[in-house]
Amino acid sequence: MGAADVVPGVSGGTIAFISGIYEELLTSISAVNFTTLKLLKTNGIKAFWKVVNGNFLVALLLGIFTSILSLAKLISWLLEHKPILVWSFFFGLVLASILYIGKQITKWNSIAIIGLLVGAAIAYYITTLQPLISENSSPLFLFLAGAIAICAMILPGISGAFILVLLGAYKPVLDAIHNRDFKLIAILAFGAIVGLLSFSKLLKWLFNNYKNYTLVVLTGFILGSLNKIWPWKQTLTWRVNSHGIEVPFNQQSISPFSFEGDSQLALAILLSIIGFAAIILLEKIANSSSNK
């Protein structure tokens, strides 16, 4: 999940869903509220820890943050120097996740089809939005960016990292991680906690009351997000980042046969297949673990 959340266009929520921990994650997060905090005061840490599924949350968060801290530099380098190959791998991964989540939809009717199309349209529209030109690293802005992005991170198909890109916060956040600026990281994390506790309760309610339709819309989100991670892009406009380097600002998806330069088509297809197979393998591991 940490590695996925670093990539602008891939959602850690998708990985959580595929690995079979998504609903447990929502239940555990939404259990953190004023009532359980009172339980901590009256009954002690042991009772509180059990109610919020503490072992699960700590193990998951440690894995996410370890992955983000260790892979942020590598993924940034790969996105800059090998973008087609990186996007190809994640395209295959996300494509397989659509099939995986789609299999869990138990009822198809006109409302479900509309929900799928609406979810796909919303996600596609988000992928076509232009990022903000300015990069902002003020504490208040990073707090708000963390709160908004975390909502996307736990939604399968909507990338929290891409939301940071749209807000103009992606580069400041990566810089804070690279430079070990723990003050800015803490501000971002606090915003993320506030957003996470609020949004998880809504998602938990939707799963409890409208699970089938929620799955339909989430599948649509992932389907629509494929536009963002399509490997071959044409750059329409450029911008100069904070380091004085010219980088793509506005891009659109094109055919690999229309791509200027080496499309790396054969290797891209291979990596897409590997990404697709990785999800199938992850699904089998999750199923075997749940059957034990």
Positions of predicted regions on the chain:
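Multi-pass membrane proteins that catalyze or facilitate reactions on polyprenyl-/lipid-phosphate substrates
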Residues: M1-D5, S11-L155, S159-K292
